[in-house]
Amino acid sequence: MNLIINDKTASSSVGQTIGKAARLNHAHVGYVCGGHGLCQACYITVQEGADCLAPLTDVEKAFLSPRQIAAGGRIACQATIAKEGTVKVLSRPEEVRRMVFSNPFQLIGYAADMGKDTAQQIVPGVQNLIGRIQRGEMGGKDALGDMIESIQGAAGLVVEAIQQGPMALPIPFKEQIADLISKLPLPQIQLPSISLPQLPSISFPQLPFSLPKLPFSLPFLPQQPQATASLEKVTITVQPPAKD
């Protein structure tokens, strides 16, 4: 069996799931839910050899959208190798990692599509999960063994990636991402200057009549100061009449 995961050859056999083969070969495929198909961290895109895999399981039909299925999407922990041949797949973590280093702008549309697919399959996914819980398919020794195997596979992937160098790590360093973003030709956005319009002056019209003066003062109106009369000193001189 010729299985190629993320452009790397992985040893595998008929009857084995791609997820199990990926764990045993420390391939860059997500390991979270222990093979129950819940997290979709092991989502893969089959690039070649889809006819060598078994048909979609009920779990895949519940959690994968029609768009993902049409694009060759499978869940690695559910996709079983049915016959000999060449199968080439690309995992979601590796696909995202390549986008970060090649064309980060693709991540916007990629994330939007994945979010739409997830929202579209919430109801059938939950129904499938409830059915498996009722049938007792979510526990037992097999589930514990799958979980332990997933942890061991993830640890082996990290150790192997560190030995190969930083570029092989599943998640790029934040320093690398920051350096990449700083080199992107992002356009400078200049905000336009906004000038507020001048408000027109408002003049109240003159009343055609004058209000009568009240004989008393209102308590809420300020008292007008009364003008004080100024006294002027006047000298009167009386002269007696002249004699004839």
UniProtKB/Swiss-Prot annotation:
GO aspect biological process, one term: photosynthesis
Binding site for [2Fe-2S] cluster: 33, 39, 42, 77
Keyword GTP-binding: no
Subcellular localization, as worded in the UniProt entry: Chlorosome
Keyword Cytoplasm: no
2Fe-2S ferredoxin-type domain segment(s): 1-95
Disulfide bonds: none
GO cellular component: chlorosome
Sorted UniProt keywords: 2Fe-2S, Chlorosome, Electron transport, Iron, Iron-sulfur, Metal-binding, Photosynthesis, Transport
SUPFAM superfamilies for the chain: 2Fe-2S ferredoxin-like (SSF54292)
Cofactor (UniProt): [2Fe-2S] cluster
GO molecular function, one term: metal ion binding
Cofactor comment: Binds 1 [2Fe-2S] cluster per subunit.
Described function: Could play a direct role in the oxidation or reduction of the quenching species formed in the chlorosome.
Protein name per Swiss-Prot or TrEMBL: Chlorosome protein I
Organismal lineage: Bacteria, Pseudomonadati, Chlorobiota, Chlorobiia, Chlorobiales
Underlying gene: csmI
